[in-house]
């Protein structure tokens, strides 16, 4: 702490005697023989190792924000409606790629697959975003706040030769997320009646 981070415990001990304040030194937190620190967590996230980073945090790494309209490609072309978020510019994000995710909306919890990146297969303006397909979810949540926790890295962001290839890969990613959520969190698909009548308007 202090100028050029020159302060340390020894300095605080001397100052506590000089200025008569009580000093309590908290030992560094360790997990499996390694020190838990924000620097280590940021390093793990920068390498896409979200599972390792999450073990060191009280809550998994998450992106919070309202759901915004996208280009409607997910529902209309790919048959996979997605919830789109635009993170703050200074938000620390892992490498562009696809991640298994857990989504919190109001008091409900869902699972899905999230793409962090710029959607390289889709032509047009590129900007960093988080796009999440929520498993077995059929609600309109535009302009609603959601929390998206990234649980596991699936694959890097890729550019596909066609929208058909992209759609096939997205469905494979979704099935991977379903298996992962079931294996690690006991997730079971929710059965909906009159599904078409309640189909989501997310794009």
Walk through the language-model features, giving the residues of each.
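An acidic, carboxylate-rich microenvironment
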Residues: 11, 40, 52, 162-165
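Glycine-rich, Lys/Arg-enriched anion-binding loops that position phosphate/diphosphate groups
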Residues: 16-115
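Phosphate/ribose-recognition catalytic cores of enzymes acting on nucleotide-derived substrates
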Residues: 70-192, 196
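A short, hydrophobic C-terminal helix/tail in secreted or cell-surface proteins
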Residues: 197-203
């Amino acid at each position: 702490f202090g100028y050029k981070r020159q302060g340390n415990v020894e300095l605080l001990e001397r100052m506590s005697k000089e200025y008569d304040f009580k000093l309590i030194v908290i030992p560094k937190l360790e997990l499996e023989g390694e020190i838990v620190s924000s620097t280590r967590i940021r390093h793990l996230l920068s390498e896409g190792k979200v599972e390792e980073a999450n073990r060191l945090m009280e809550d998994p790494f998450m992106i919070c924000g309202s759901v915004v309209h996208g280009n409607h490609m997910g529902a209309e072309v790919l048959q996979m409606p997605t919830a789109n978020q635009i993170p703050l510019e200074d938000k620390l994000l892992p490498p562009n790629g696809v991640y298994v995710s857990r989504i919190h909306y109001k008091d409900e919890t869902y699972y899905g697959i999230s793409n962090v990146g710029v959607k390289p297969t889709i032509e047009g303006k590129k900007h960093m975003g988080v796009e999440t397909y929520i498993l077995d979810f059929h609600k309109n949540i535009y302009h609603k706040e959601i929390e998206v926790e990234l649980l596991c890295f699936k694959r890097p962001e890729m550019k596909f030769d066609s929208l058909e290839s992209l759609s096939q890969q997205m469905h494979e990613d979704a099935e991977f997320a379903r298996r992962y959520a079931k294996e690690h969190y006991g997730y079971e698909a929710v059965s909906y009646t009159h599904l078409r009548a309640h189909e989501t308007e997310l794009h």
